[in-house]
Amino acid sequence: MTEGTTTRPERLRTDEAGRPLGAAAVVIGGGLAGVTAALELAGAGLQVTLLEGRPRLGGLAFSFRRGGMSVDNGQHVYLRCCTAYQWFLDRVGARHLAPLQDRLDVPVLDVGHPSGRPRLGRLRRAALPVPLHLAASLATYPHLSLAERAKVGRAALALGALDPEDPALDGVDFATWLHRHGQSARTVEALWDLVGVATLNATADRASLGLAAKVFKTGLLSAPGAADIGWAHVPLGELHDTRARAALDGAGVRTALRTRATAITRSADGGWHVDAESGPGTAERLDAGTVVLAVPQREARALLPDGALDDPDRLLDIGTAPILNLHVVYDRKVLRQPFFAALGSPVQWVFDRTESSGLAGADGAAQYLAVSQSAAQDDIDRPVAELRERYLPELERLLPAARGAGVKDFFVTRERTATFAPTPGVGRLRPQAATGVPGLYLAGAWTATGWPATMEGAVRSGVQAAGAALSGLGRPYRDPLAGGGGMTRRADQACAPRTGRA
């Protein structure tokens, strides 16, 4: 690209009679939301250009090389109820690389009792209908008293009666609701926060009841297998970058990496100019009828043209929450399970990433563990040396086999703005996909998907943005997330755009 170059992707492909097969679209942002929107728009016949400022796709779910290992910036999992993310994996040909458990089984180690020795409990399901599928596991869960377990059952039934889309739930914090329903501080720690912190990136006192109800009702109470856990058995970059890029290429999308959008302005014919830079002294102007803005909320605010939202500064009121990941390479095997969750320790979740990182082939004796710390406000800025001093002894408490093992490597990855903060009241701040100006749409896990900031929410936002865009063009739309495979219908019947306040 050179200074002053103008690209006009609106010159459409035509059929034999010379009729245009599509219209031009620019998608800004190459995370899961942007990739999804680009694939859907291209699949509907639009000529799509995808702009991404980084040298890779995948947003905050990516991999990098360290020595002989492929390292994920953070441990990402999904649940069987995450149908949109599974559709995405299918779309990029990667479902087999991120398999699900046959049946939910979460080992939970507690070192917070007087003996200090690790005590194992398990959260797992039986082959029974909801809610009996979890009853046996709850009845024998050793980290709660018998009375606490009984109260969990009653609270779960009450939670199942809530409507996550009820706006009244958005203004209440989850902890207050749990307290009203008889949940002790220990129960919150050993069960509700054990799951909620990992999925919401917030403790119960900082989480909207609406979003918490969405997580627990969908994951635990919608179907027996809804909470079965899946995760990538290869580096995330293989899924979200390599295979995503191949899918985009196959769909005819032009992908421009290391290219940052700098402005979105109206063109004289009612379309859009998107100005972009790919380095010092290089600039490009793309003309399109459709623009999807799939970047974090603060970046979106900076690019929004006048009239897009009634109060665009409300996007700045959507807070963020950090995630910290600690990476430890031992000189021998110290963990025999693929993962576990912890209680009575600052450690939250630990995953064995030896195989997926490639370390197993390079050093058969070593083991690489990834320690995932959500809602990490207290630790996110601690120096590496301090984190090492804090967490290595905790891993030895949880894993006796780690005592005396050599630590070959210890490093940290930090995502200070990993997700939007799911605080009470955030729902009224999250905008719909359609904006107040024709042809401009928003995507990202922070938009109004009804989900917390997850890979599922990101993919759903991309589908919503594409559906709204196709509605604006009056095009038929096959909703890939509709039940029964998705009935072909007009986009305005599937995803009607809404304007007004975000």
Descriptions of predicted regions:
Residues 2-4, 20-21, 104, 259-398, ...:
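Mid-domain catalytic core of redox enzymes
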Residues 20-50:
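N-terminal Rossmann-like FAD-binding beta1-loop-alpha1 element of flavoenzymes
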Residues 42-66:
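Glycine-rich FAD pyrophosphate-binding loop
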Residues 76-83, 166-170, 181, 223-247, ...:
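Short beta-strand to alpha-helix junction loop
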Residues 85-86, 90-91, 96-209, 213:
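Mobile amphipathic helical/loop "lid" adjacent to a hydrophobic cofactor/ligand pocket
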Residues 214-282, 286-290:
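Helical element adjacent to the flavin cofactor pocket in flavoenzyme catalytic cores
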Residues 357-363, 415-442, 446-449:
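FAD-binding beta-loop-beta segment adjacent to the flavin cofactor pocket
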Residues 447-469, 473:
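A conserved FAD-binding loop/helix module that cradles the flavin
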